[in-house]
Amino acid sequence: MTVNGHHTNGVNGANGTNGHANGSNGINDTKAVKEIVPFVKPQVNFASAQRLEGCIHSLPELVDFNSLNNQHHTFCVQAKSSEPFDTITHGEFKVAVSKCAAWLKENLPIRPSSDDKALTKMAPVALFMESDIGLVIHEFALMSIGVPPLVLSPRLSPVAINALLEATGAASFIVSPRMSEPLKGALAALAAKGVSTHIGNPYKAYYQPGADPKSVAPFEVPQNPEDVILLLHSSGTTGLPKPIPTTHRQLLFAVNCHKFDTEEQAQSLNLSTLPLFHGFGLVAPGLSMSAGKPTLYPASDGIPNAKSIVDLINKTNAKSMMTVPFLLDDITNLPNEEGIKALVHMDFVGTGGAALGAGIGDRLAKGGVKLLNFYGTTETGPLSLTFAPTDNYDWKYFRLRTDCEYKIDELEPRDGERRFRLTVYPYGSEGFEISDQLIRNEQYPETDFAAVGRDDDVIVLATGEKANPLILETKLTEAPMVKAAIAFGENQFNLGVIVEPAEPLTPDTESAFRESIWPIITAACDQMDAFSRIPSPDAVVLVPAGVVIPRTDKGSIARKETYALFDKQIKGVYEQLLKAAADAVEPLDLDNLEQNLKSLIQEHLHIQAPASDWGVEDSLFDIGVDSLQVLQLRRILVTAASKTEAFKDTDCEKMIPPEFVYMNPSIREIAAALTKGSDGGDVSLEDAAKEVVELAETYSLKGVSAQEKAPSSSEGAFVMLTGATGSLGSHVAADLARRDNVAKVVCLVRKDKGTNQPPMPGGNPFDKKILKARGIQLTDEQFGKLATLEVDPTADKLGLIPMAYGMMQAKVTHVIHAAWPMNYLIRLRNFQYQFKFLRNLLEFASQGPAPTKKRFVFISSIATVARIGLAQPGSISEAPVSPSDSACGIGYADGKLVCEKIMEKAAQDYGGQLDVTSVRCGQMTGSKKTGVWNSNEQIPMLLKSAQGLGSLPQLSGELSWIPVDDAASTVSEIAFSDGSMPIVQHLENPIRQSWDAMLQSFGRELGLPAGKVPFGEWLDQVAAADGDDETFPVKKLTFFFKSFFQSVACGQVVLDTTVSRGQSKTLNAMTAVGDETVKAYADYWKSTGYLSK
């Protein structure tokens, strides 16, 4: 702690110490923090245009003040790729800025602006550097000598940089060593134009631990607070970035947007990932200078990602964070909620820029994270307050700061909501009207608002960048052949545009029209930011004849209504763009992988650095790859790997996760990780069993309950159903709706990202198309029993608001869990989403105020006992099995086994509240009533491949097929059976048939000869056949058909149904699948075009 100028080691920052970070030694060393030395608050004044006695009017003065009055308080901590980190005090920061200023004056042509109409008195110096303490030192060094820095975003194109340099009259250009490599050509071009170009020094050249600020002179005091001293930039109405001049007064306004209740809140470490080239990026160092809140900067030798940020939080015990929604989203979605756990202890987690999805925000808030909404504009600076929320503050709203004047005007209501306009007077009498329309929190009507739309309709892309489509829309509308144009792309990676022709088009004239407007689009895009450009003609939606773009009463295009009208076409655009990108990517060349990867990256990521300037061991981040390009690269790698023969049986999305490039940042590391991922290797049965046990223990309900509830009744049943869009689930929904004893069926639907669930259970009607597409007919009264409820399957309390969750618990009497992904290639650990879903459903069912037990039916699979059936002759009993006997190393089968174990544990520990059963299902076919059978299942795929080959395979053994509508009735009857349910039951047709007879029956319907070629040889013929996997769909699952199909489908595994037949009259009365049903299946596939007639 600081006492009379003396200091001790430590890095917390809250204690005013000077120690330098030794990784975890010091940053978390709370023993060293015995008391918090108050931070001497400076007397700043941004309201006055004239200098006042005793007041600070500029940031350089603030640096001097803190170097004398808060010398040993921590200014910032700069993290590095390896510890120890650098802790810089206010005294040391002052010395570093002074030394940097001396280097600037010695090496740069410091001169006044040559144009009388220039924005600044002195010619600016452009800074193109990483967002770390080095950039801060250079910024403040330039300001200290009266030279405005022009801070450039690393994402700017060369055209945009040139435009800003010309608009500001910049005399010099400083680039960091790391970012200089990709700009070699551009730097030479700038030098040729007379711009003095320099490679800047790293901050270590100026930072001197323990330096005495008294050893350097005070900075010269600026005489006019209205002088422009900083140039930021944004995208303006011209489409190119425009310079934003910022005065001394504006900067002081920006750094004073805080109100902390205690010194502990004010002085705790604040992690900032906000880019320093953005106006909000200066808030973090500003908090350090005005409130004593030290900033923690992530290491600058890579792009911050969710995992690295969480690791940094845990190492440093940072107590607050300022970040962007994109990164916060990734942090929230880290496995095992490690991101939320890292954030929950913080005083606040502030975010702004692009919108934070409601789903992510609600999830964080429910997890106890204190979210803070930032708001401001580039022109005004921050308008929201930075504080530690302690009241019932709602994160969806920002809280206005109260140290400046503003007025709120009410606008006309829109969409049933009151709307408001904010005008602020941040520094002087001149007001600035904000273009955003606002809504307000009626609990805090004077201070808490949320932005809901802009008058200028800027489109915020998925990256948080704001694209202004005015140039594009104007250029197109000015063309005589175009009546109207409106861009789209909110939360996407590219813009698209809807074009309404002046004259109606016919199918014959669409192509020519598209060709005629494309040069206009490309010319407009040449004047726009790179991220705002239309990527290809595929991103153009043409308004068909007879359709009119919606307009307001004033005649302007109604964007929201237009987007809704063309929602299907807009979605189609992005699907087509993804497909086009995928089509352009070739399979990986594993024999020459490193060079192949480099070529892929150079071609598709448009790396500025020439290929000759970087190698396979260089970090991609060192050659200028940014976070958006990381996303693009991951998509390219997944696509290329998916097309590669060696990976055909691999889930490439899982093999190459979102953090893959961050974890493997060089070509060599990517190649090694891919090669390692391809050898896979079989999982030993012992390891498979251990993994099943481990996952079952992890996801089982915790604790034991002795509470005993009364048995449930089947009358007036209120059923919660999952998987209602699938084959079995949709038939279960219909079967339940037809039953007189069922009052309601609520089908859980996975909530889309960023949407809100209805506040009351059963709030949304069931989509009738789901059932009608399967030929299922219900009366209006029966449809009325069906409803949907949007949930987040893995979120606490299913992501529902407490009222909805509680009411559902009170009403639901039965739960039928049928949702499950049909994929035999996914590894077991990739089913953890499903395990979390089951646990959440069991938690829901085992708790709540209902007086009776809930009956819970889990749909399992014959695959869980396939290993036992193959090893031992005879039927398998309806009883639990040991993982050591049944785990087989196949993710799908072992995943269902994990769930069975979770169900058994729930029955053991919560038997008083739950009556549970796992129903192992055998092979289900299509409906015997309608003939509808999903063409993406194994049997239809086999038959279509047989048509393509001209012959059926020879299959021996027996089959046990049950039509899906009979299976659905069986599930319902099990759920409503009398007495306690058996812990395990089997759902398989007890009547067995020969494969030979079944293939003969299908052969007659398809005109194919009986199978004479053994199945293995037949598969080889399919693999060698000249045709794609649309003609021969078995090719899509070659691994499954070769390895598992015969053992699973040909009667080697027999399920005993003695118990379940006692529970279900439908199952007890089952007959064989006859020729009429086979004909119905074949006729259905022919009617859809799947099979040839």
UniProtKB/Swiss-Prot annotation:
Region feature Adenylation (A) domain, mapped onto this chain: 35-392
Region called Thioester reductase (TR) domain, residue ranges: 721-971
Catalytic activity: ilicicolinate B + AH2 + ATP = ilicicolin B + A + AMP + diphosphate
Pathway: Secondary metabolite biosynthesis; terpenoid biosynthesis
Leader sequence segment: none
PROSITE patterns linked: AMP_BINDING (PS00455), CARRIER (PS50075), PHOSPHOPANTETHEINE (PS00012)
Stimuli inducing this protein: Expression is induced on AF medium.
Use of this protein: Ascofuranone is a specific inhibitor of trypanosome alternative oxidase (TAO), and quickly kills African trypanosomes in vitro and cures infected mice. As an essential factor for trypanosome survival, TAO is a promising drug target due to the absence of alternative oxidases in the mammalian host.
Domain notes: Contains three distinct domains: an adenylation (A) domain that activates the substrate amino acid which is subsequently covalently linked as a thioester (aminoacyl-S-PCP) to the 4'-phosphopantetheine prosthetic group of the second domain, the peptidyl carrier protein (PCP) domain, as well as a thioester reductase (TR) release domain.
Protein family membership: Belongs to the NRP synthetase family.
Designated name of the protein: Non-canonical non-ribosomal peptide synthetase ascB
Organism from which the protein derives: Acremonium egyptiacum
